[in-house]
Every structure is written in C-alpha cells, then in structure tokens.
Amino acid sequence: MSYTPVTFCKVDFRKLIPVQWHLWIGVFQVLFVFIAVGFILFFKLRGNGLILMESILACIICPCASAAAIVTQKLGGNIEDMTTYTFLSNFICAALIPICFPLIEPNVNVGFADSFLVILNRVCLILVAPILVAYFTKHWRMLQPLYKWIVRMNNLGFYFWAFTLTIVTGTTVKNIIHADTTILFLVFIALVGLLLCLAQFAIGRFIGRFFGKTIEAGQALGQKNTTFAIWIAFTYLNPLSSVGPGCYILWQNIINSIELWYYDKHTHTS
C-alpha cells in the first residue's frame, strides 16, 4: 500500500523492538481465538450459527493493520511500537491458522510451512517492501530531498490511507449488498461485528492503561487487517463469513474517525 513507505519514513528503525504491552495484547488475541474455536466445537455449530462464529473468528485471528501506525501517529502515539507489533501480529496469525481452522472446517488442510509462507509473502508485500523503500529513502543521499519533503508533509500518509480506505469501503459495500443471504442475517452479522469491534478496541485500551500506551494497545487489538481477514474467510472458511470482516472495516474506521475528531478537538482547545 502506498501510504506505508510514507509512514515508515518517519520511523526510527533503531526503536523497532518488542515491548511489554505487545506480549499482553498477543496473549489476549490468542485467548479470544481459542474461546471462539472452543465455542464452535462445544456447541457443534452448523449453518448460520457457524457462519456467524467464523466471521467473528476471522476478525479476531487476522493481524493488526499496517494503517494502525498512521492512526496511532495522528493520535500522538508511538509509531515504532505499532510498527513492531504489526510484524509480531502477522506471525501470531500464521501460527494460529493451521492450528484452528482444520478443527472447525475438516476439509481445510493447512500445514504450518504453507501457512507461514503465505503469511510471510503478505508481510513482505505489505510491510517489508515498504519499510525497505522507506529505509533507502531516508538514508540514500540521492533521495534525501524526497525524504525531507515527506517529513515536512505531516498528513501525506494519512491522505494516502484515506484514499485507499475509500476504495476498500466501496468494494466492501458492494460485496455485502451482493451476499447470498437474507437482509436480516446480514444486519445481525453487522451488529455482532460492531460489538466485537468495540470490545477489541476497549480491551486493548484497558490493557494499554497499565503501560501508559492506551492509544497504541487499542489500535493493536482493535484495528485489523480486514482485507486479509476477508481473504482467509474466502480461502479457508465459508465464503459468506467474509461479510463479518467486511462490516468490521466500516466499524473500525468509524471508531478511528471519532478518535481523530476527539483528539483534534481536544488538542485545539487545550
């Protein structure tokens, strides 16, 4: 995504190290995944019940969005902490998928090696490639004028993100409208997605309070790579469960918009 190299130009690469709150956010993500899988297995869910829980699982198991670093920076948080956790969450996801998905979808045969290669490929495309571009832009003398211009443009990454978000949201709405199910069930999935989104942001912020990292931890647990969630739903689960992550895109960005508005208002009035 074009906004990530712009954002990573402002990262201090020496500070990309795991910190204590990363562990707790990761632990809670794993715990929530096991609770969702356990619920499916214990109640032997089938039909719409299984689709609903699979849509929830896809929203929990998927990694933190790379855009979380942009929002965190706009909210005055630590961009290095967020960038580091984005990498870590991708590996958590890679470990959980081959463990959990074969349990709820017997036809799914996901090996650890295959899963890790798929995740690593996506990590390289979404994170590693942009961060390498940013690193060379920052340290290569020929590109110093470009680097200085990017640093001066405080909102450049945010504008790229907003543009990308508009396209993704439009595609998501189209997919939801054409979903092969009843309106009532779509509304129910959307409402459950809203509750899940609020819960993940709230729990993340609660954990972050103990480390003075409310903004970062809330974004880490709440803002998800929903494009990846939709892909895993189509690839490994019932394709209809992709509606859950599709709705989650809308909810998480409404929450982000409210947080950005509140932060901007508070900053200008203080």
Model-derived regions: residue spans:
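Alpha-helical transmembrane segments of multi-pass small-molecule/ion transporters
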Residues: 1-270
